[in-house]
Amino acid sequence: MQYQLLALDIDGTLRPDAQPCVPRENVAAVKAVQKAGVKVAVATGRCRGGISKALLNGLRPDYWICAAGAEVQDAAGNMLHDARMDAQQMYALVDFFEDHGCFLGFNFDDGPYGYVNYYIQREAELAMNVNSYVHDGEDQDRHLESMPFSAFGRLPQALAEQFRQKYGHLGLRFLFYGSSEGCDILTAEQDKSRGLEAVCAAMGIDPAQAVAMGDGSNDCGIL
């Protein structure tokens, strides 16, 4: 079968953790795939507004599977799939992270915002040698314009179980980055695979004609 679509995670896959952007050799390899006639989608936990040109280093995806499948666009920016957290989910997260002194951010249309303990994220970005991409949102008013696609945070992994015990009825899932304290926080229905299905539908192809690459727990659906 001829493959028509290649879906690639960014952080840890296209961009090695120790580098501030996608390396030139990876950009060249992806462009070669596109030149061969295969469409390329980035499939990431980041929202579209949290992916800078500098990060991609010249890479131009044909499709964007962002916010772990909740924000899906074509190259022109047309929305193919859009799913949001509700107010109850969002406020429960804010209360919990404030109570435990941990960092919490949300992914919005215009980028990611740090709502709780933003300074923790800034320190982490400096330590990881990546450009700052999270807005200071500690005024906690960005959601009055539109609700977020997803959340992300930094907390001891044991605290995620405490959150589930208290707010399990909300269906939120904590997907940690390996053994670290960083995580994506997704709704029960949210998955990169839903974004992949939306892209395949837009292309008029069967998902079996797609190939995916990723390295994290939020990539399991597309793999």
What is each of the regions a protein language model found here?
Residues 5, 63, 211:
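Hydrophobic "anchor" residues on beta-strands that sit immediately upstream
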Residues 10, 68-69, 213-215:
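Glycine-rich beta-strand-to-loop/alpha-helix junction loops that act as flexible
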Residues 14-16, 51, 73-76, 182-184:
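A short acidic, helix-capping loop that chelates divalent metal ions and anchors anionic groups
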Residues 100-222:
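Conserved acidic, metal-coordinating active-site core of Asp-based
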